[in-house]
Amino acid sequence: MKKIFFAIAISLLLINSYAQQKVCVAFYNQENLFDTINDPNKNDEEFLPEGKYKWNSERYYAKLNNMAKVISALNPDFLGMCEIESIHSLTDLISTNALITSNYQPVFFEGPDERGIDNALIFKKAMVKEARGKIFTINPEGLGGDKTRGILFANITLNNNEHIYFLVNHFPSRREGEKESEPKRLYVASVVKHICDSLYKKDAKANIIIMGDFNDYPNNASIKEVIGATGDVKAMPTNGFFNPMYNLMEQGKGSYRHKGEWNFLDQIMLSHNLVDCKTKVCYKTNSADVFKQEWMLETEEKYKGNPLRTFGGMKFLNGYSDHLPVMLYLDIK
């Protein structure tokens, strides 16, 4: 009798393990993943073989392999990215030796950004039944006439027939100054919110993941007030979002280091349904984190501990990115 009971218990455990998958969702700023080909419609002159950064094939493939090394170690099932110039650089990335066996599929659209850098989503083909996407371009009138990255939208149908809606973002930078440039980020955040409200109107239980480099922190107005993302699950409005990076920020962690201080420009936010865990897709509590390995960091004393980037000024450092990836896990039944 004991042997029979033990066999049944093992069988139930096996069934349960097959019925539920632990899925990694991540975002990673690729820091200027330009190809070496001149595009007359883009301001890519600095990243050409004869350009400012002497962006030749050797440096390009070193960059691809370095980024692939990070992605392979992270091993995401869904990865949002920004600062990708073209579908060529994206397909070259997922075709590297480190990533080819993962069979990543891309969602990518060329946008109106003046530098020609765009957002992307890649996913493991084995996870997905169907993927559809589009780009929401940002009206330049809301940005004082500037053109910026569009919002990448992907409607992913999982093998269990659940839908996840991804919004991949790269908000306007703080180059003009934090306060001076804030209205631009507030405007783009309002577009994100409008898209999400439209999804909620169609389905109050929509599974929505907002991710990106927001050039703002979790406690800035664009995130906290406009998008309505909070670090307190209990304080979430029905059409709001849970931002696990808020709590990580309070622990002193971060994806980007500025003047010795870590903070989160890169964030992943989840709709109410993903944290309520009442459906087949559920956020794994406290699973959000920054992916950081020693080999991804500077060792030179002056910059020790900073993300090891591709260039330090004009010097080719043969690094990865000036940002670290952010990640979390979902349980999918």
PLM ranges: what are they?
Residues I84-H163, L167-P172:
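Structured beta-strand-rich core segments of catalytic domains in phosphoester-bond hydrolases
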Residues D35, H88-T91, R115-D118, R175-E178, ...:
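Extracytoplasmic/secreted cell-surface and envelope-processing proteins
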Residues Y18-N103, V107-G111, I117, M296, ...:
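N-terminal, active-site-proximal structural segment of metallo-dependent hydrolase catalytic domains
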Residues Y28-Q30, M67-L90, I122, F166, ...:
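Active-site beta-strand/loop signature of hydrolases that rely on acidic residues for catalysis
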